[in-house]
Each structure stands twice: as C-alpha cells, then as structure tokens.
C-alpha cells in the first residue's frame, strides 16, 4: 500500500528544529509522499526549499489560504498565481473559505477561492480545500465554477451529514 500525507505544512518555521527528523520519521513510518499546500506569499520559498531537499518525497501545491486573504489580497493572489508558470505543482491549495475566526473578508475569500478553482480547472490540477463554518459558501462556489470537473480533497471535514452528502456528488473526497 502506498501512503500519502495529503496535507501538511512541515516547511513552516515552527518545524525548523526537527524538520529533517520529522521527514525521516515519516519515511520510516511508511509514508511515501508528502503533499505540501502553500499558505501565502511569505511561505512559498520555504515550501520550495523543503521540496528541493526531498524531490522524490515532498511535492508542492500552490494557493492562497483563506485566512491569508486581507486588504492586500489582489496583490497576493497575483503573486501566488505568477508561480504557477515557474514550477511544477501537484495541486492548487490550500484554498477555501474560513469564517470561523473572522468574517471581515468574506466577500474577498469567496472571490479568491473561485479564482483558484478556475486555476485548478485550467491546469487540470486537484484542489486541497480548507473550509470552516462556510459550507454553504464553499458549495455555492464549487457549483458556480464547476464542481463536476474538479478533483481533490477537503483536508478537514467538520460538516454535518447533509454536507457530507453534498460532497459525495462531486469528485472531491
């Protein structure tokens, strides 16, 4: 059996002291692949550095995390998108809508999410979706953009049974 860790942020500074040790532990535990979704423009280089150190083990995704959407979102989204032509990515992520902590940029999160879903469709790449307290908004965007053509994962699922059923009608897991 091939084991894939579909979502981690091992490249973040919090893991610096043990980063190589954690990669070794993952490999020794039978994990064959790490998929690394990006957070924002400040984490891109660190993510790439980790993937460059472990080229047959760690694979990058490109995206702008919903909690990183702020007053500078348009500039940050453009910079994030610019990387798509510079390297190979295994997916678009971490993307989504998160209304758990703050709803200040709810409209902007939806706009950013839908744009990144279009990247996924245009590039034929799977998505890693982050959603908290925003299932109606996420599903509205998925169906608006074309859920029937998307593949990928919800990296965390805290929804109810009806929301789980809605996921089952997509190509997302």
Predicted features and spans:
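An N-terminally biased module of ancient metal coordination in phosphate/nucleic-acid-related enzymes
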Residues: 1-59, 75-81, 85-167
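A generic structural signal for short coil/turn motifs at secondary-structure boundaries
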Residues: 13, 69-70
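Conserved small/polar residues in nucleotide/adenosyl-binding loops
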Residues: 170-173
